[in-house]
């Protein structure tokens, strides 16, 4: 049996045919920037054909409550690259939960996970990055112990099924919430 890496099209199909159809939400690639648009159906746009972008944007959707899912981009602010220290600290605070879920999704399909600081102005030696990585790992550990939120678990389960179908190198198939 050979393993292959997942494609953006497979991620889209997996989401749209599992949790997406149930929740009236579609996942679409090809966007120049990720964006969530409420409507009928709600649409999660991810960047170009980047699988990590797809998983990250689905993680944000899984974190957003029903009220936030009625707002464009869940009502979040976004400061572009070049954030100052206080903006970067705020970014870290809101990114812990979605990036912990993203790690679970990445492991379900055998994709390497690294935190994203989403700011080219941040020095890789900045101690805040290590603190952020630790916070994401702590949250991920909590998910391993306590299980994923319902929508995230449904999507993770679908990813695991696709991993089996397409022979992706899943490293997480039986560890979380099962």
Positions of predicted regions on the chain:
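Active-site recognition of the HExxH zinc-binding catalytic motif
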Residues: 52-65
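Auxiliary, metal-adjacent structural segments of Zn-dependent hydrolase domains
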Residues: 1-39, 88-95
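Post-HEXXH active-site segment of zinc metalloproteases
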Residues: 63-96, 114-123
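An active-site-proximal "capping" alpha-helix that borders the catalytic cofactor pocket
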Residues: 92-107
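Substrate-binding/catalytic groove segments of enzymes
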Residues: 105-117
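Short pre-active-site segment immediately N-terminal to the catalytic Zn-binding motif
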Residues: 3, 38-53
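Pan-zinc metallopeptidase signature
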Residues: 117, 121-178
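Helix-loop segments that flank and shape redox-cofactor active sites
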Residues: 35-42, 76-78
């Amino acid at each position: 049996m050979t393993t292959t890496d997942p494609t953006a099209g497979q991620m889209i199909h997996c989401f749209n045919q599992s949790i997406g159809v149930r929740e009236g939400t579609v996942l679409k690639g090809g966007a120049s920037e990720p964006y969530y648009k409420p409507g009928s159906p709600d649409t999660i746009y991810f960047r170009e054909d980047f699988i990590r972008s797809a998983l990250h944007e689905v993680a944000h959707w899984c974190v957003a409550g029903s009220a936030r899912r009625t707002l464009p981009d869940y009502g979040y602010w976004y400061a572009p690259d070049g954030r100052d220290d206080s903006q970067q600290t705020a970014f870290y605070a809101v990114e812990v939960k979605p990036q912990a879920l993203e790690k679970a999704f990445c492991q379900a399909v055998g994709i390497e996970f690294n935190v994203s600081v989403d700011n080219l102005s941040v020095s890789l030696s900045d101690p805040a990055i290590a603190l952020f990585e630790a916070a994401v790992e702590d949250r991920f550990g909590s998910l391993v112990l306590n299980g994923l939120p319902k929508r995230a678990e449904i999507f993770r389960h679908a990813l695991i099924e696709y991993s089996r179908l397409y022979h992706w190198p899943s490293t997480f198939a039986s560890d979380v919430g099962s």
